[in-house]
A protein has these predicted regions:
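Hydrophobic packing and interface segments
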Residues: 1-280
Length: 280
C-alpha cells in the first residue's frame, strides 16, 4: 500500500518546520548571547558583581523559555489540528526535521570554531602576531566561532532534545498505554484504552506547561532574594544564587508535579499518579 501524497506532503511540511524551528531558536540564542556578552562587559565597569551574574542568567532563561514554548506550541498544533491517523507520522517527521537541523548547526558551529582557531595559529606562526593580539584577524573570527559553537549548537540541541523526548513519550503512550494481552499473547486495546491514552497525553502536556511556569516563578523568586542579598556587594560567590535557584526550582517543580498528577490521573488505579510523578 502506498502512502497518499497529501499525507507525505504533510509529513514533509512538519519536517521542514522542525528544521526551521531549530534554525530560528539557534539564531535567537546567538543574538541574545551577543547582547548579553556586551551588556555584561559594560556592567562590569560599574564595579558591582550582581549585574555580572544576573545578566547572563537572565539571557539564559529567556533562551530556554523561548525554545521550550516554541516547541510546545508546535507539538500542540499537531495534536489538536492534525487528524489522528496522520498525527503520529507528523510527530515523527517533526522530530526528524529538528534533529537534522540541530545536527547541522552543531557541526557547522564546531567547524567554524576550529577554522578560526587554525587561522589565528597560522597568523601567529607566519606573521609573528600573537593569537590574542587585536591585529590578528583570527581573534575576531575565533570570537565569532566560539559564539557559534557555544550558542547556536547548544540552543538547537535543547530544542531538538525537548521535542524528541516529547515524541518518544507520546509514541510510548500510544503503543503501550491502555493495552492488554489477549489469550493468544498479542497486545490489544482495552475497552477504555483510548480514554487512558488521551488522559496521559493531556497530563504530559500539562506537566510540560507547568514546568515552564515553575521555572519562571523560581527564577523571579531567586532573583529577588539574590538582589536583596548581593545587590550592593562588590564581590560574592556566584555559585550561591545559582545553587539556590536549583533548589527552589527543584522543590517547586516536585510539589507541582505530585499535586497536579494526583488531580489529573489520581483515579487511574494502581497508584499510577505517584509512580509517574517519581519517574519525571
Amino acid at each position: 500500500n502506498q502512502t497518499p501524497l497529501p499525507m507525505v506532503m504533510n509529513i514533509l511540511l512538519w519536517s521542514v518546520l522542525g528544521i526551521l524551528g531549530s534554525f530560528s531558536v539557534a539564531w535567537f540564542g546567538m543574538r541574545i548571547n551577543t547582547y548579553a556578552n556586551a551588556r555584561t562587559a559594560f556592567a562590569s565597569l560599574k564595579g558591582k558583581a550582581f549585574p555580572v551574574m544576573s545578566l547572563p542568567l537572565r539571557s539564559g532563561m529567556s533562551i530556554g523559555v523561548l525554545l521550550i514554548c516554541v516547541e510546545l506550541v508546535m507539538m500542540i498544533i499537531i495534536l489538536l489540528f492534525i487528524p489522528r491517523e496522520n498525527a503520529g507520522a507528523c510527530f515523527i517527521g517533526f522530530a526528524i526535521g529538528e534533529s537534522l537541523g540541530a545536527s547541522a548547526l552543531r557541526i557547522c558551529g564546531g567547524i567554524f570554531t576550529k577554522i578560526a582557531d587554525i587561522g589565528a595559529d597560522l597568523m601567529k606562526i607566519i606573521f609573528k602576531i600573537d593569537e590574542d593580539d587585536a591585529r590578528n584577524p583570527g581573534v575576531i573570527a575565533d570570537c565569532t566561532g566560539d559564539n557559534a559553537g557555544d550558542s547556536v549548537g547548544p540552543t538547537a540541541d535543547g530544542f531538538e532534545t525537548y521535542g524528541v523526548t516529547g515524541v518518544a513519550l507520546i509514541s510510548f503512550i500510544v503503543l503501550a498505554a491502555g493495552m492488554s494481552y489477549t489469550d493468544n499473547g498479542s497486545l490489544a486495546l482495552m475497552a477504555d484504552g483510548i480514554d487512558i491514552q488521551a488522559r496521559l497525553i493531556v497530563w504530559i502536556f500539562t506537566m510540560r506547561l507547568l514546568m515552564i511556569i515553575t521555572s519562571v516563578v523560581s527564577y523571579m523568586i531567586n532573583n529577588w532574594f539574590s538582589k536583596l542579598r548581593f545587590g550592593n556587594k562588590q564581590d560574592f560567590d556566584f555559585e550561591v544564587p545559582l545553587t539556590s535557584l536549583v533548589w527552589i526550582t527543584s522543590l517547586l517543580s516536585i510539589a507541582v508535579t505530585f499535586g497536579v498528577s494526583y488531580v489529573m490521573i489520581g483515579g487511574m488505579g494502581e497508584d499510577l499518579w505517584w509512580k509517574l510523578s517519581v519517574i519525571i
